[in-house]
Curated annotation (Swiss-Prot):
Its main location: cytoplasm. Transmembrane segments: none annotated. Residues 3-83 form the Toprim domain. Mg(2+) 2 binds at D57, D59. PROSITE patterns: TOPRIM (PS50880). Binds two Mg(2+) per subunit. It comes from Mesoplasma florum (strain ATCC 33453 / NBRC 100688 / NCTC 11704 / L1) (Acholeplasma florum). The gene is rnmV. Mg(2+) 1 binds at E9, D57. GO terms for molecular function: metal ion binding; ribonuclease M5 activity; rRNA binding. Keywords: Cytoplasm, Endonuclease, Hydrolase, Magnesium, Metal-binding, Nuclease, Ribosome biogenesis, RNA-binding, rRNA processing, rRNA-binding. This is Ribonuclease M5.
């Protein structure tokens, strides 16, 4: 994972990834929602020479951190996702550190590129094709290991960031 920096929420996430991939893996810890302008500017500086991979927890704060970073950067951002189902059932936390090694490897092998400049579908297309309906949102969310609780507005934004076209989304729903 040369020239890659994985953005995680905390120390235990970094430790888990380094246990799997070795101590040479480079992570950047946001310290949860404590991500501030200084950290965002550091990430922006790192993005000039490195591939940025966001790998946050599959919960509300993780989603917020991911959106904050994507909105701040002007480059393609790579995203790794684990789902809540990938978390150890005996854990009280819903974090990356509690995910299985297999789920982490799968997530990092299946990165999704986001770019905030992408506009691949319009709101009219989104509504006309019933992508906003909860049942369809759940199918789409599960396909990408996103939260099933994601709002219609957020999903619309994220689908654009992924540069998905109507036919791509229809294919996902039809699977």
């Amino acid at each position: 994972m040369a020239n890659e920096i994985i953005i995680v929420e905390g120390k235990s996430d970094s430790q888990k990834l380094k246990k799997i991939y070795g101590e040479n893996l480079i992570t950047f810890e946001t310290n949860g929602l404590g991500i501030d302008d200084k950290k965002l500017n550091s990430i922006k500086e790192l993005s000039k020479k490195n591939k940025i991979i966001i790998f946050t927890d599959p919960d509300g704060p993780g989603k917020k951190i991911r959106e904050t970073i994507i909105e701040f950067l002007d480059v393609d951002v790579f995203n790794a996702f684990v789902s809540k189902q990938d978390i150890d059932k005996n854990s009280k936390k819903i974090g990356l550190a509690e995910a299985s090694e297999e789920a982490i490897k799968k997530a990092l092998d299946n990165l999704i590129t986001y770019n905030k400049k992408n506009i691949s579908i319009s709101w009219d297309e989104y509504v006309k094709n019933d992508f906003y309906i909860k049942a369809n949102r759940i199918i789409i969310a599960n396909h990408f290991n996103l939260s099933e609780d994601m709002s219609s507005k957020s999903l619309f934004k994220w689908l654009n960031w992924m540069n998905l076209k109507v036919k791509d989304i229809e294919k996902i729903i039809g699977e």
